[in-house]
Amino acid sequence: MSSNIAVVGDRDTVTGFRLGGVREGYVVETPDEAEETIRNLIRDGFSIIIVTEKIGDELREFIEETTSSSALPMIIEIPDKTGPSERETDPLRDLIKRVIGVEMVK
């Protein structure tokens, strides 16, 4: 493995990150395909996995189970080309609070 960062998402998101220098990018079409890809990345030792918010919403329970017991891997959710989704909570804010134990922004 040449990188500790991978991106999982739609073709446009993955292409954008590859152009930005992220070597490991995986285009997925279904939630099952996304979950299998993320499981493989975790098994391969990736410490940061970037996914689109759509994937995050579809795999919420799996992501929370995966990230609740340790700081790594970090699964970071980003908007796709359609823009940010409306949410009551911010997964990135929750991750920061869990990792450092303090809420940074109120």
Swiss-Prot record:
Gene3D superfamilies: ATPase, V1 complex, subunit F. Keywords: ATP synthesis, Cell membrane, Hydrogen ion transport, Ion transport, Membrane, Transport. Pfam families: ATP-synt_F. HAMAP family: ATP_synth_F_arch. It is a peripheral membrane protein. The keyword Translocase does not apply. It is found in: Cell membrane. GO terms for molecular function: ATP binding; proton-transporting ATP synthase activity, rotational mechanism; proton-transporting ATPase activity, rotational mechanism. InterPro entries: ATPase_V1-cplx_f_g_su, ATPase_V1-cplx_fsu_bac/arc, ATPase_V1_fsu_sf. The keyword Membrane applies. Belongs to the V-ATPase F subunit family. This is A-type ATP synthase subunit F. It comes from Methanothermobacter thermautotrophicus (strain ATCC 29096 / DSM 1053 / JCM 10044 / NBRC 100330 / Delta H). Has multiple subunits with at least A(3), B(3), C, D, E, F, H, I and proteolipid K(x). Component of the A-type ATP synthase that produces ATP from ADP in the presence of a proton gradient across the membrane. One of its GO terms (biological process) is proton motive force-driven plasma membrane ATP synthesis. One of its GO terms (cellular component) is plasma membrane.
